[in-house]
């Protein structure tokens, strides 16, 4: 039993009810039709309203930021401790692949299921409860605490851009949108798209399916083609056609594009197939997939001359994904993650030499905080006090709001050894992990704000 156990047990039922309230809201960020005070659509606005109700009930003052972000504040003052998370989510695509309703909290055999239980509604919520528990214990706060929720982390980050235009940076802080023990490095992100013009072919590509979710290598893709003269084809191809159309399916293993080494990318199986039957496909499609296979197969970028390994942050990575058919061209995207010691302009130059019409569509600066910093030392102490394990900092390819902080890192809430299926069907988190993370956050906020 720790000093926080009584209060964690006291609040567990309320915590799960509040998490269910948040999970039930399909708060997918949508900036296509912004209205006053709802720049990210009705879903995010609804989540902000629910968050406000919860925070006020727990004793926070709540500040709205024009619908871009919402802050639950305990005490006033400029030199505050900041906890930055998000209430927007990735849409629960392929609901038939979910074992349980993604928009309802399900607790089964000690596991919490639902969109947002891990990313990031659950971790954000338990930080509200951590502050409440410290107050109940009579702890003296020497610094204010703000638990800030954004509404566009999964998309544009316009939430935090707007918030910090008018709000001072915290003295120090963290984002509960990563992993334990401590994420002191987040690789730089570059996303490019290259396009190849369409040409004539015996096969006309009618549709490409499987790339509905951004920044995800799918487990399966399908290419539907039309052929006018099926009788002219070889027998092995002819049998695949019905009414002049055929659908070819290629399977692999899904993974986030930031972890291409964990995937079996079905794009490369498609590329092999198209190369084998290149005499039937249009030249642009053949050329694009040939270059994808030649330059992007190695997940660390050795084939496209961008490989680098840093002693602290690890290797570069690159993933090919999002094959699309446009009006006059075919395109594919490349998601790159790079450590310190790499010049992003050199990466772009290397890829420009290999791919025509390269267009940069996303860039985020890397984050690296030396492990001897005061912030990391205090968070390491908090982690050790609960787990009795030394907190060795790690680097991730993902992006958290820690990148917008002058002094901040990602800290939890995912523990090593459990696959939360973040951004995928059946997102989940063990209840014991959530409660253990709550205990760690209690100690972390105590060390940052009360000592």
Each language-model region and where it sits:
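Acidic/His- and Gly-rich active-site-bordering loop/insert found
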Residues: 2-113, 137, 141
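Midchain, well-structured core segments that form catalytic/ion-binding scaffolds
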Residues: 154, 161-339
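Active-site metal-coordination/substrate-binding segment of hydrolases
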Residues: 80-149, 155, 168, 424-427, ...
């Amino acid at each position: 039993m720790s000093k926080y156990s009584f209060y964690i047990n006291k609040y567990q039922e309320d915590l799960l009810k509040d998490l269910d309230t948040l999970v039930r809201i399909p708060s997918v960020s949508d900036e296509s039709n912004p209205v006053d005070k709802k720049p990210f659509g009705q879903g995010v606005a609804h989540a902000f309203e629910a968050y406000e109700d919860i925070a006020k009930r727990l004793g926070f003052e709540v500040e709205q930021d024009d619908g871009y972000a919402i802050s639950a504040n305990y005490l006033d003052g400029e030199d505050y401790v900041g906890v930055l998370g998000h209430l927007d989510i990735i849409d629960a695509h392929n609901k038939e692949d979910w074992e349980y309703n993604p928009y309802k909290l399900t607790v089964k055999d000690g596991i919490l299921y639902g969109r947002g239980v891990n990313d990031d509604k659950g971790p954000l919520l338990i930080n509200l409860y951590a502050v409440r528990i410290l107050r109940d214990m009579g702890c003296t706060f020497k610094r204010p605490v703000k638990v800030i929720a954004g509404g566009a982390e999964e998309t544009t980050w316009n939430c935090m851009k707007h918030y910090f235009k008018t709000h001072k940076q915290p003295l120090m802080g963290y984002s509960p949108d990563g992993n334990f023990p401590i994420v002191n490095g987040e690789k730089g992100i570059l996303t490019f798209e290259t396009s190849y013009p369409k040409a004539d072919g015996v096969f006309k590509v009618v549709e490409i399916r499987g790339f509905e979710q951004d920044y995800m290598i799918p487990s399966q893709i399908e290419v539907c083609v039309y052929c006018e003269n099926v009788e002219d084809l070889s027998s092995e191809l002819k049998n695949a056609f019905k009414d002049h159309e055929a659908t070819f399916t290629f399977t692999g293993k899904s993974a986030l594009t930031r972890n291409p080494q964990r995937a079996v990318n079905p794009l490369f199986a498609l590329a092999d197939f198209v190369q084998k039957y290149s005499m039937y496909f249009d030249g642009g499609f053949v050329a694009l997939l040939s270059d994808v296979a030649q330059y992007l197969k190695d997940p660390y970028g050795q084939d496209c001359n961008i490989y680098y390994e840093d002693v602290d942050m690890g290797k570069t990575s690159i993933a090919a994904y999002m094959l699309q058919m446009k009006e006059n061209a075919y395109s594919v995207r490349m998601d790159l993650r790079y450590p310190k010691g790499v010049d992003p302009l050199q990466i772009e130059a290397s890829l420009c030499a290999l791919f025509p019409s390269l267009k940069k569509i996303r860039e985020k600066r890397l984050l690296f905080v030396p492990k001897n910093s005061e912030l990391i030392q205090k968070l390491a102490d908090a982690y050790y006090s609960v787990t009795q394990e030394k907190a060795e900092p790690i680097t991730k390819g993902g992006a958290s709001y820690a990148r917008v902080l002058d002094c901040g890192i990602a800290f939890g809430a995912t523990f090593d050894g459990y696959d939360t299926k973040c951004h995928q069907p059946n997102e989940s988190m063990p209840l014991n992990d959530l409660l253990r993370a709550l205990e760690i956050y209690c100690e972390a906020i105590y060390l940052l704000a009360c000592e």
